[in-house]
C-alpha cells in the first residue's frame, strides 16, 4: 500500500536530460571508494534508483555536476543503512561514527577513517568547489544538524522512548531526512548562490520547512512496512495512531491532507518572493538566483521526492528486516587499520 498512496503535488515533474548516462555510470564512484564491493550490494543499490532521484532533484544539472548529485544520493542511503541495526540503537556508537564523518567538514581525514567518512570527505570537497566561504559555512551548519539528528534518534531507540506527538517527531526528523543539504547542493550543481541576507528570511525559512516536512511525510508513508517489520516506532503513521488513537488508514489520510495544506501554503509563499526581492533590495543577478532557487531547488526536491518514492525499489517488501537485524550488506562504518 504505502508506495501507491496518492498525493496531489501541484508542481511539474522534471528530470535531467543527462539522466541515462548518469544512471549507467552510477556505481563507478561508490566502487572506487570501497563503498560498494560485492555484486549483491551493487544489485541492491541499483534497485534503489538513486541516480533517478538525483536527476529529479537536479534537473538543471548535467555532466560532473549531476554526477555529484548522484554520488550524494548514493552516499546518503549507504550512510543511513549503517544505522539499521545495533549501531542505530546505541547513542555512543552512533555518535562515534557521525563524529568521524563530520570531521571532514573541518579538514583532511586520517587514513584510518572509515570508508563512509572518506566518501563524505570526497563529496564535501567537490561540493565546495567554486562556492563562497559563506555558502560553505552555511552548508556545513546544515550537515552538522543532520549528523546530530542521528544521535537524537539513537537516544530515542536506546531508551525505548518513541516520540509522543507529531510535533516532537517533526522537530527531530527534520534534521535526519537530509533535505536541507540536498537543497544546498542544487545551488552548487547550478553554480549559483542565494543571497545570504535573504536565506534566513521568514518567507524562505517557511518555504524550506515545507519542503522538509513534505519529504519526511512522503518518506514515512513509503517506508512504513519496512519500519513496521523492524519494530521502529518513530514513524508519523505510528505516532498519529498513538497520539490520537486513529486507524492506520485514517493516519495516512491525515498525512495526505497535511501535504495538501502545506503545498497550498507553499504556493502562497512563492507568490511573496517578488516582494522579498524588493524588501531586501536585490539586484537583477540576485533576483535571478532567488528565482533559480525556487524552480531548481525547492520545487524539484518536493516533486522529485514524490516521483522517486513511487518507483524506488528501496522500499520493496523483500528488504524489510526483523528487529535487531542489520540493514546493510557491507560494513562501511568501521575504521581501517
UniProtKB/Swiss-Prot annotation:
Binding site for Mg(2+) 1: 80, 84
Entry binding sites for Mg(2+) 3: 219, 223, 227
Transport keyword on record: no
Chain location of the short sequence motif DDXXD motif per the record: 80-84
Impact upon substituting residue 309 to S: 3-fold decrease in activity
Named cofactor requirement(s): Mg(2+)
Gene3D superfamilies cross-referenced by the UniProt entry: Farnesyl Diphosphate Synthase
Record note on what altering residue 77 to Y does: 20-fold decrease in activity and catalytic efficiency
Effect of residue 219 to L: Loss of activity
Pfam family, one: Terpene_syn_C_2
Superkingdom classification of source: Bacteria
SUPFAM superfamilies attached to this UniProt entry: Terpenoid synthases
Enzyme class: lyase
Co-factor remark: Binds 3 Mg(2+) ions per subunit.
Binding-site list for Mg(2+) 2: 80, 84
Extra remark beyond the main annotation: All the mutants retained substantial pentalenene synthase activity accompanied by production of varying proportions of abortive cyclization products such as germacrene A, protoilludene and beta-caryophyllene. This is a true derailment or diversion of the normal cyclization reaction, and not simply the consequence of trapping of a normally cryptic, cationic intermediate.
Known partners and oligomeric status: Monomer.
Comment block on domains: The Asp-Asp-Xaa-Xaa-Asp/Glu (DDXXD/E) motif is important for the catalytic activity, presumably through binding to Mg(2+).
Protein name: Pentalenene synthase
Species whose genome carries this gene: Streptomyces exfoliatus (Streptomyces hydrogenans)
Taxonomy of the source species: Bacteria, Bacillati, Actinomycetota, Actinomycetes, Kitasatosporales
Gene name of the record: penA
